[in-house]
Amino acid sequence: MNNIIKMLNDEQMKKDVPDFGPGDTVVVQVRVKEGDKERLQAFEGVVIAKRNRGLHSAFTVRKISNGEGVERAFQTHSPLISSIEVKRRGRVRRAKLYYLRERSGKSARIREKLATK
């Protein structure tokens, strides 16, 4: 029974998910259906949390829109997500960056992770 569930989960998981983590700036292309038309909507922001649970993996992205903080949670392997692109790697020392909710301006900045040779 357990093998059947694992096999079905592996079948439904996306293979093209890039490697990203908390602090990284990502652009998530989401399929939005309005009436009978379908289009792609980009959501760019900082990953503040990531949950790794196989098929049930999820991540939360936060951005500032018109001076207001907006957070959106995505299922990593959802068919509604067209693509995930990593724009910038962030250097952080926490797995969950919920403290960014209380911060704004320069104190909410995240240092960039430089590539190591």
UniProtKB/Swiss-Prot annotation:
Q: Name one GO cellular component term.
A: cytosolic large ribosomal subunit
Q: Which family does it belong to?
A: Belongs to the bacterial ribosomal protein bL19 family.
Molecular function GO labels:
structural constituent of ribosome
Any idea what this protein is called?
Large ribosomal subunit protein bL19
The protein's matches in NCBIfam families, at most eight in alphabetical order, are given as: rplS_bact
Q: Does the keyword ATP-binding apply?
A: no
Q: Which residues cross the membrane?
A: none
Q: What domain of life?
A: Bacteria
Gene expressing this chain:
rplS
The taxonomic lineage of its organism, from the top, reads: Bacteria, Pseudomonadati, Pseudomonadota, Gammaproteobacteria, Alteromonadales
Q: Which Pfam families match?
A: Ribosomal_L19
UniProt keywords, alphabetically: Ribonucleoprotein, Ribosomal protein
HAMAP family (UniProt xref)? Ribosomal_bL19 (MF_00402)
Q: What does this protein do?
A: This protein is located at the 30S-50S ribosomal subunit interface and may play a role in the structure and function of the aminoacyl-tRNA binding site.
